[in-house]
Amino acid sequence: MIYFREQAKCTRKYVIPYIEQVVSITPRFRVLEIGCGEGGNIEPFLDLGCQCVGIDIDVVQLENAKKYLSSHPGFERVTFIANDINKVSSEEIGCFDLIILRDVIEHIPNQEQFMHRLKNFMHDDTIVFFGFPVWCNPFGGHHQICCNKVLSHMPWLHLLPNALYKKVLQWGGETQGKIQALLEIKETGISLHRFERIIHKEQYKVLQHTHYLINPNYEIKFGLRPCVLPKWLQIPYLSDFYTTAMYYLIKK
């Protein structure tokens, strides 16, 4: 429930205002969240009267989402689907006015293929929001989830070679399941340059993008005030090492 509340608060306070710099979200909107987890990001859109669909491969998290949102007055306006987005067709769920991927793209394998298929769920005016940690940032490998307090606070740990990274995690007493999850993130983590190369190749139009020195979500988790990275520090490749989050709005 804690993570659900963190998601809901950050989306309500930062993500929705960011999107509304480009488009006003109205009750007529159909909203798709890919990788919805426990549904915290969906709650603020239900508050706005939107029709929502949440897709995730984690059945347990989806059951939590249903439980947490069951008392919401707009619960009948949300549908949850337990599946891989790559196995879902637009014939099944249709197209959407807004698609949300928050802290998700860095977990998806074959990102080029995914970004191509994403268009199947878009009409000409669909806007897609991406929020993701750049791979090379101090905690881009999500190793802050480690139980070992030293490892969870060690910046850039995930940039070690795979074999050494695995050994360090084992030394730190992490479970085999957590080690495997962190190694999978290492396989799919995405750099800013690579993300931009993919959207350029797929001919998406970038409506807005923002580099964050301090991720907006860090305010909810750690009490740190969000901070946009100054333009003069947005140095290609180098800024990947200190940009903790990117926000993007794109369309076809």
Protein language model annotation of sequence segments:
Residues 29, 125-126:
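Surface-exposed loop/turn positions
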Residues 43, 64, 110-111, 139-141:
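Short glycine-/acidic-enriched loop or helix-start segments at secondary-structure transitions
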